[in-house]
Amino acid sequence: MCVKESGPNPESNSRLKALIQNSRDANMPKDNVERAIKRATSKDQADYKEVIFEGYAPHGIAILVETATDNNTRTVANVRACFNKCDGSLGTSGSVEFMFEHKCHFKIAQGDRDLETFEFEMIDHGVEEVFAEYDEEKSLDTIMLYAQFAEFGNITKALEKMDIEILSSGFERIPMDNKSLDAIAQDEVEKLLERLEEDEDVQAVFHNMAS
């Protein structure tokens, strides 16, 4: 969807650039990335739209589902069926979205950067939260940056001007409050999450169940 919105040139499409960076980080072959871009800009993809669904899983867990679809009727039916089969309920627009903050995030190598000094520098570019995190997979000390969704492009450009390599970046909907459940109830919610994630139109699923 990011290709359709802003074009297939990663230099002018920061969201696409992030997708390519993340694909490389996951060791996805370059040919696969290029095919995905070509597929997204083809005529067949011209009618795809982003649609967000909101609802509740069992035990009052809020669910937010991001989809990309060329047939809204099909996607609505499939998502509704997922909720119904798992004792959940599909809600109306705005019923749970207010429970989540739409954020963007970036991961960079820490190197010899002083965390506090770097945080002050990045606040001017819209960053709200900065913290150190050890990447076990890469055996690397990293810095995570979080900001509002709308600041993604500004922060990408700021990091590039500083010649800072972005290891990965993306978007999240972070619940403002989490709800704790016992193990049995968690399993019931997980069944719905898994069913939704298996649908080919679903891009991401967010919830407020405590881990």
State what each model feature region is.
Residues 1-11:
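Intrinsically disordered, Lys/Arg-rich N-terminal extensions and targeting peptides
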Residues 9-15, 50-58, 90-100, 164-176:
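Flexible hinge/switch segments at interdomain interfaces of large molecular machines
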Residues 10-14, 24-31, 69-77, 112-116, ...:
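Ordered, soluble secondary-structure elements with a strong preference for glycine-centered loop motifs
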Residues 10-67:
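Translation machinery proteins
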Residues 27, 33, 79, 122, ...:
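Residue-level signature of catalytic and energy-coupling elements of molecular machines
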Residues 44-45, 83-90, 111-114, 119-123:
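A general structural motif
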Residues 54-68, 73-102:
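RNA pseudouridine synthases
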Residues 102-211:
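Positively charged, low-complexity, intrinsically disordered RNA-binding extensions
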